[in-house]
Each structure stands twice: as structure tokens, then as C-alpha cells.
């Protein structure tokens, strides 16, 4: 199937699954409005890539079909993400006295600062989600942003939110494969990615495309999901944690930090900053919203968010969705999605506690001025 045929098929399926006007619906309201047959198909498309096998053959199968796996993943989890997390699909560090939304915005602004994004810059957001970080960074810097995404549903939502918050003149969102970008070479002043390039089957592939479209002298800043130097691929417990993260987060293979850093160098980048922001011995761990530890909640406004994302909140949601699915209110497959997300949460927390995994390894890399 050609690239254009794949895009057309995905667009048609997205319309069938989510329906008209889906961009304005969020959370469980959006979930309950799905076409039931299409939802079942979407879940099957995603879960067929994860059958409990961690051998190389199963891994290679996921790597080969990364585009469809990622598209299917975000078709089925976007509503759950918005319900539990908001419109910025990433983790962050937390400081004492800082509420959840402030921490998320600061995390995004810090990346923009490290990338040197300034007013008037044309910036590419690789794997933009529903545009939460793009809106924050555009307001923070005054730059103009193009968001790249392979999921039609998320693009619809990102455009809807940009217009809703009167930012449509500062940003646009386009469909594309980050392993095969269609932008002109040397187009962007800066590029950033927030917990998105981990979906790539090969990091040199996505980093090479970023290098191509970035202007000489331009900067690429990324929060990368990687397994740390403590991770041992031959350790069964370590591999189980990595697999739980892969299954619940639509990732064909979790790479190590050394692989990521070398991939940047291999495509021509000069790596200026290489730092794990999760390894700062913070009093409040980055994974606290998933743990159920109320002692870390910083404000009254965080209570609802924390409950939805905590262990007990996730169990409540799973139970509620299970009942709705049984009585025919929620589409078939919804419970399987919540189960996959629960597996991911367990793996993320365990990986974080044992310092095997980080969702915020910061790389700041420069394309040489004399790059051709």
C-alpha cells in the first residue's frame, strides 16, 4: 500500500470511528460517542501488535508496522489521556507548592528555553499530540509552530483548540510520517519533540529527518523516553518493565540512552546537552500522579487530576468503563484499552522507582553552521 493510500484509509477510518464534530468532545463524553464497530476494530488493530511475546520476531513485527501501530494507539487512547491528564500528553518534574498544570507548562517552557526559541522563529513540533505544548510555547515565545502528527483525530483536535484559544495565526497542524517528512530541507529555525520520537522504529530515522528540515545552525531539543544505563536487556525483570511500557504506550521498542545519544551523532548533530532530568533526586518524583500517594498532592486543584490518574482512580475508571461496556453504553474494546494503560502505569512507576526508565532525558543538539 502506498503512503497516500495509507493516509486516505486512515482518514476514512478516523471519520467512521470518531464521527462528525468529534474535535469538540473530550474525555468520557468523546469515548461514549464512538462508532462501536469501528472502536472494536481500532482496539484489535492496536493489540494485535502486542501478544505477550518479547522475542526478536515479535519485536521486529512491531518495528516494521510502527506507523499503523502508533496511529491505532492514539485512536484508542487519546480520549483517556485527555480525561486523565489534560491536553499535554507528557510527564514533568514537580516542585513543592507547584500545581500539576503549572508544572506541565514549566516543563514545556524549559524545553523552549533550552532550544533558544524566540519570537518570529518557525518551529517544528514533532509528534504534537493535540497541541497542548505548542500552545504553551507559542504564548511563551511568540514563535510560529507547525505540528506534525500521524493521527488524524489528534490533528482535528489540535486545530480546534488553536482556534478556540485564538492561536490559529501562530500555528498549524499537518499529517505526516516523522520517518519521512515532506517539508523542504533547511525549513525550520528550531525543532522540538516531547516524548514522541520514542515511537520511531529506528532513532536515526526520525533524527535524520529532523536534521534534514532544520536550518544550518538550528537547534533540536527533545525530551526522550529511554531506558537508562541501569537497564539490562538480558534481565527478565527489566525486560518485563520495558515491555509493559511498550504495550501501554504504543512503542515498538524502548531504546537505551546510549543508543539515542549515538543516533543523534550518527546523523550529524552536535550534542550540546545530555541530561536526565528525572535523576535530580527531586522530593516529588515525576511519576507521583500514577502512584496513589496523596502526600505529594500540591493543591486543591490537583485532587481531581490526581484521583483520575492514581492507582485507585484508574481502578475506578476501569470498573466504570467495564460496566458501561457490558450494558452497551461504552463500545466493545474500551476495557482492553484501560487494561493496557494500567499495565503501562505499572511499568512506568516501577521503571521510575528502579531508575531503569526516564521520560525526560534532555538532549539539546545543534546542526552545524556549515552543514550541507
Swiss-Prot record:
Species whose genome carries this gene: Candida glabrata (strain ATCC 2001 / BCRC 20586 / JCM 3761 / NBRC 0622 / NRRL Y-65 / CBS 138)
UniProt keyword list: Lipid biosynthesis, Lipid metabolism, Methyltransferase, S-adenosyl-L-methionine, Steroid biosynthesis, Steroid metabolism, Sterol biosynthesis, Sterol metabolism, Transferase
E.C. number: 2.1.1.41
GO terms classed as biological process: cellular response to xenobiotic stimulus; ergosterol biosynthetic process; methylation; plasma membrane raft polarization
Composition skew (Basic and acidic residues), residue ranges: 1-23
GO cellular component annotations of the record: endoplasmic reticulum; lipid droplet
PANTHER family reported in the protein's UniProt record: HYPOTHETICAL LOC100005854, ZGC:194242
Protein name: Sterol 24-C-methyltransferase
Gene: ERG6
Amino acid at each position: 500500500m502506498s503512503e497516500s493510500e495509507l493516509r486516505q484509509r486512515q482518514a476514512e477510518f478516523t471519520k467512521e470511528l470518531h464521527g462528525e464534530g468529534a474535535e469538540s468532545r473530550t474525555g468520557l463524553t468523546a469515548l461514549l460517542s464512538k462508532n462501536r464497530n469501528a472502536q472494536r476494530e481500532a482496539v484489535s488493530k492496536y493489540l494485535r501488535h502486542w501478544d505477550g511475546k518479547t522475542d526478536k520476531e515479535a519485536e521486529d513485527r512491531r518495528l516494521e508496522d510502527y506507523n499503523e501501530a502508533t496511529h491505532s494507539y492514539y485512536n484508542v487512547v487519546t480520549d483517556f489521556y485527555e480525561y486523565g491528564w489534560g491536553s499535554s500528553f507528557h510527564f514533568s518534574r514537580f516542585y513543592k507548592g507547584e500545581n500539576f498544570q503549572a508544572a506541565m507548562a514549566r516543563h514545556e517552557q524549559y524545553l523552549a528555553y533550552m532550544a533558544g526559541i524566540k519570537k518570529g522563529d518557525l518551529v517544528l513540533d514533532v509528534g504534537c499530540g493535540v497541541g497542548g505544548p505548542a500552545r504553551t510555547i507559542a504564548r511563551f515565545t511568540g514563535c510560529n509552530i507547525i505540528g506534525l502528527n500521524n493521527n488524524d483525530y489528534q490533528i482535528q483536535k489540535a486545530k480546534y483548540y488553536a482556534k478556540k484559544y485564538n492561536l490559529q495565526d501562530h500555528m498549524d497542524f499537518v499529517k505526516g510520517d516523522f520517518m519521512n517528512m515532506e517539508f523542504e530541507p533547511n525549513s525550520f529555525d528550531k525543532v522540538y519533540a516531547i516524548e514522541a520520537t520514542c515511537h520511531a522504529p529506528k532513532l536515526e530515522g526520525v533524527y535524520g529527518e529532523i536534521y534534514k528540515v532544520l536550518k544550518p545552525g538550528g537547534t533540536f531539543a527533545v525530551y526522550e523516553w529511554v531506558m537508562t544505563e541501569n537497564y539490562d536487556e538480558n534481565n527478565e525483570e527489566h525486560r518485563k518493565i520495558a515491555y509493559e511500557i511498550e504495550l501501554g504506550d504504543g512503542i515498538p521498542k524502548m531504546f537505551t540512552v546510549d543508543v539515542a545519544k549515538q543516533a543523534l551523532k550518527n546523523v550529524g548533530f552536535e550534542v550540546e546537552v545530555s541530561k536526565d532530568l528525572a535523576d535530580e533526586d527531586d522530593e516529588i518524583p515525576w511519576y507521583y500522579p500514577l502512584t496513589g500517594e496523596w502526600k505529594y498532592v500540591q493543591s486543591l486543584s490537583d485532587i481531581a487530576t490526581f484521583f483520575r490518574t492514581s492507582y485507585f482512580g484508574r481502578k475506578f475508571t476501569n470498573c466504570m468503563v467495564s460496566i458501561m461496556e457490558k450494558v452497551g453504553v461504552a463500545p466493545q474494546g474500551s476495557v482492553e484499552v484501560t487494561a493496557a494503560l494500567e499495565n503501562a502505569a505499572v511499568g512506568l512507576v516501577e521503571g521510575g522507582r528502579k531508575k531503569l526508565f526516564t521520560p525526560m532525558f534532555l538532549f539539546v543538539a545543534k546542526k552545524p553552521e556549515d552543514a550541507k
